[in-house]
Amino acid sequence: MSLRPSTKTEIRRIRYKVSVDAEEGRRRREDFLVEIRKSKRNENLMKKRRVKVLPPDYKLISNDPFESLLEIANMITGVFSDDPSLQLEYTTRFRVVLSFDRSPPTDNVIKSGVVPRFVEFLKKDDNPKLQFEAAWALTNIASGASEHTKVVIDHGVVPLFVQLLASPDDDVREQAIWGLGNVAGDSIQCRDFVLNSGAFIPLLHQLNNHATLSILRNATWTLSNFFRGKPSPPFDLVKHVLPVLKRLVYSDDEQVLIDACWALSNLSDASNENIQSVIEAGVVPRLVELLQHASPVVLVPALRCIGNIVSGNSQQTHCVINCGVLPVLADLLTQNHMRGIRREACWTISNITAGLEEQIQSVIDANLIPSLVNLAQHAEFDIKKEAIWAISNASVGGSPNQIKYLVEQNCIKALCDILVCPDLRIILVSLGGLEMILIAGEVDKNLRDVNCYSQMIEDAEGLEKIENLQHHGNNEIYEKAVKILQTYGLVEEDGRLVEEEDEGGDGCSHPEFQFDFSR
């Protein structure tokens, strides 16, 4: 005999489970975020090497090994000369070597012993050209591997770069900004070292209305590196930077827009306190506008930031909805956008459907559910997963009428189809969604005491899939599958369906639409 809970018990259980699973659903999917953060994006590099195109006839080092050794020895001698003109000439030569776009000989330059000399040149306030060339060389060393960045830090370069932010020479200031960005982009520890060296406020001063476009671009990029990674920098820094970022997201320059949006994305990928500060800064309406930007490299960080904000509390999510984000997200799902954009749009919607019934209704009213179901059935697997999250979250937190609407949009078929995927977590997410649909069916049984949704799961070939999961190697999946089969009237002790059709039919009043189960 099947175990079947009473209606009152199930109503209480629905309310309890919604409160628990909504929080689970609202969590950022760390596996997903780590995956997209690891992907290389040219517009969001943590380090940048400054290169300069040389004339075709420029000859730096001979191809002959013996002559090459002599030339390198001459370069070292020139750098350590007391003649300022030779210092500048040969520091420039080393800088050019370090500016090679591919495989610069950074290790050999470090081993040559010239780094301490470059550090000395940073202090030559009376020779800004030499300061600039030395700063450029050190910036490119810091753009290498972590051990190269460590060499720069260990030689005391960071405090000197901070001092150079006050230089009257634009080129020197810009190069110091770039160097600090490379050091901060290496790791959380390096980022914190730069911040603890007093770089933050002087950097903000570079982002004034009189800055050159080149300085504005580099300072915005460095600022985005200051807020990259976890744990986040101290909250006091957030309060200082938001007014600046609010101005930058209205820039006409695409590169400034990109890095300002990444900075906001990094800021919002933290506590609800950070998210609230971003909202109070008044940037959300602009971020929603940028979701319609023609350039994907602007759209992506703006979308990431919106997704982070709606992963906050319900009030914060509501603020984004009120700014008109849902129709824009609908376009991102249906227009011919990049795969990553559709995936992150689904992720963003999944954070909204993890909220209140009112917010789920907003998603329904924006006609997003049909698009989500379509993606869950036909898109690439990484998009399917996020669409399933969105659908499952809606079923977990939705009212019986909302769940009925989800069923009418063929969500049962989508949730059942994903049960054969290799992703353990998404199998559990789908089972959780199906369980909540079955709970709603228990509350809304018809006069013949039949849970119509259980029959729909069988029609969608879900019963067989759930039965197969009883043999799954993952214990949590096994237990969930057994629980669903036993608790919601899908099996008897002999394994047969309790609510299978008899000669008089199943007693369910099916919707007028037709399911397409042949796909």
Swiss-Prot record:
Species the sequence originates in:
Arabidopsis thaliana
Q: Give the protein family.
A: Belongs to the importin alpha family.
Q: What broad class describes the main subcellular location of this protein?
A: nucleus
Matches recorded under Pfam families? Arm (PF00514), Arm_3 (PF16186), IBB (PF01749)
GO BP: any one term: protein import into nucleus
The IBB domain sits at: 1-58
Its cellular-component GO annotations read: cytoplasm; nuclear envelope
This molecule's function is given as:
Binds to conventional NLS motifs and mediates nuclear protein import across the nuclear envelope.
Q: Which superkingdom heads the taxonomic lineage of this protein's source?
A: Eukaryota
Query: Molecular function terms in GO for this entry?
Result: nuclear import signal receptor activity
Query: What SMART domains has UniProt attached to this entry?
Result: ARM
Task: Outline the subunit composition.
Answer: Forms a complex with importin subunit beta-1.
Q: Which UniProt keywords apply?
A: Nucleus, Protein transport, Repeat, Transport
Instruction: Recall the taxonomic lineage recorded for the source organism.
Output: Eukaryota, Viridiplantae, Streptophyta, Embryophyta, Tracheophyta
* Protein's name in the database: Importin subunit alpha-5
Q: What compartments host this protein?
A: Nucleus envelope
Q: Where are the ARM repeats?
A: 103-143, 146-185, 188-228, 230-269, 272-311, 314-354, 357-396, 400-439
